Amino acid sequence: MEMLQGLLLCLLLSTGGAWASNEPLRPLCRPTHAILAAEKEGCPVCVAFNTTICAGYCSSMVRVLQTVMPPLPQLVCNYHELRFTSVRLPGCRRGVNPVVYFPVAVSCRCALCRRSYSDCGNLKSEPLGCDYHTSQDSSSKDPPRNLTSPSQLPEPADAPLVPQ
């Protein structure tokens, strides 16, 4: 009987470990697929393209007595390694460079937010997209005619970053 109780105890403890797993409930900071949009003055077409961004959760702490102690620095999901690639905007006026360069996440890490190259604000209520104030009446609910359909999204072509 004592051996059976020991076996039962081991079984319960091992199962409890599976329930209380170390895995987080939210995805950690990692490269994630995203669809972004690019537009440029002098180019009539907004182009949506596939890329990889850094997204996910980083561990953070908040002090209980915030008035007595300074706030703790909060970590955010940042690029660790990145490469640059480009997308070509069609139909640009003569003299306008149709190439738009953007970063592609190779790896990500939790670090302090650097405002020099990151948007440190809250999540946006609307996804990133093109500005249609000049090309469409604001009362219209129809989608813009000049946005590439999702089935025709270009994959970014690898290109070295060339200074303009």
UniProtKB/Swiss-Prot annotation:
<feature type="glycosylation site" description="O-linked (GalNAc...) serine">
    <location>
        <position position="140"/>
    </location>
</feature>
<feature type="disulfide bond">
    <location>
        <begin position="113"/>
        <end position="120"/>
    </location>
</feature>
<feature type="signal peptide">
    <location>
        <begin position="1"/>
        <end position="20"/>
    </location>
</feature>
<keyword id="KW-0325">Glycoprotein</keyword>
<comment type="function">
    <text>Stimulates the ovaries to synthesize the steroids that are essential for the maintenance of pregnancy.</text>
</comment>
<feature type="glycosylation site" description="N-linked (GlcNAc...) asparagine">
    <location>
        <position position="146"/>
    </location>
</feature>
<keyword id="KW-1015">Disulfide bond</keyword>
<feature type="disulfide bond">
    <location>
        <begin position="43"/>
        <end position="92"/>
    </location>
</feature>
<dbReference type="GO" id="GO:0007186">
    <property type="term" value="P:G protein-coupled receptor signaling pathway"/>
</dbReference>
<dbReference type="InterPro" id="IPR029034">
    <property type="entry name" value="Cystine-knot_cytokine"/>
</dbReference>
<feature type="disulfide bond">
    <location>
        <begin position="58"/>
        <end position="110"/>
    </location>
</feature>
<dbReference type="InterPro" id="IPR001545">
    <property type="entry name" value="Gonadotropin_bsu"/>
</dbReference>
<comment type="subunit">
    <text>Heterodimer of a common alpha chain and a unique beta chain which confers biological specificity to thyrotropin, lutropin, follitropin and gonadotropin.</text>
</comment>
<keyword id="KW-0372">Hormone</keyword>
<keyword id="KW-0964">Secreted</keyword>
<feature type="glycosylation site" description="N-linked (GlcNAc...) asparagine">
    <location>
        <position position="50"/>
    </location>
</feature>
<feature type="disulfide bond">
    <location>
        <begin position="29"/>
        <end position="77"/>
    </location>
</feature>
<protein>
    <recommendedName>
        <fullName>Choriogonadotropin subunit beta</fullName>
    </recommendedName>
</protein>
<dbReference type="GO" id="GO:0005179">
    <property type="term" value="F:hormone activity"/>
</dbReference>
<dbReference type="GO" id="GO:0005737">
    <property type="term" value="C:cytoplasm"/>
</dbReference>
<feature type="region of interest" description="Disordered">
    <location>
        <begin position="133"/>
        <end position="164"/>
    </location>
</feature>
<dbReference type="InterPro" id="IPR006208">
    <property type="entry name" value="Glyco_hormone_CN"/>
</dbReference>
<comment type="similarity">
    <text>Belongs to the glycoprotein hormones subunit beta family.</text>
</comment>
<dbReference type="GO" id="GO:0005615">
    <property type="term" value="C:extracellular space"/>
</dbReference>
<keyword id="KW-0732">Signal</keyword>
<feature type="glycosylation site" description="O-linked (GalNAc...) serine">
    <location>
        <position position="151"/>
    </location>
</feature>
<feature type="disulfide bond">
    <location>
        <begin position="54"/>
        <end position="108"/>
    </location>
</feature>
<dbReference type="InterPro" id="IPR018245">
    <property type="entry name" value="Gonadotropin_bsu_CS"/>
</dbReference>
<feature type="disulfide bond">
    <location>
        <begin position="46"/>
        <end position="130"/>
    </location>
</feature>
<dbReference type="Pfam" id="PF00007">
    <property type="entry name" value="Cys_knot"/>
</dbReference>
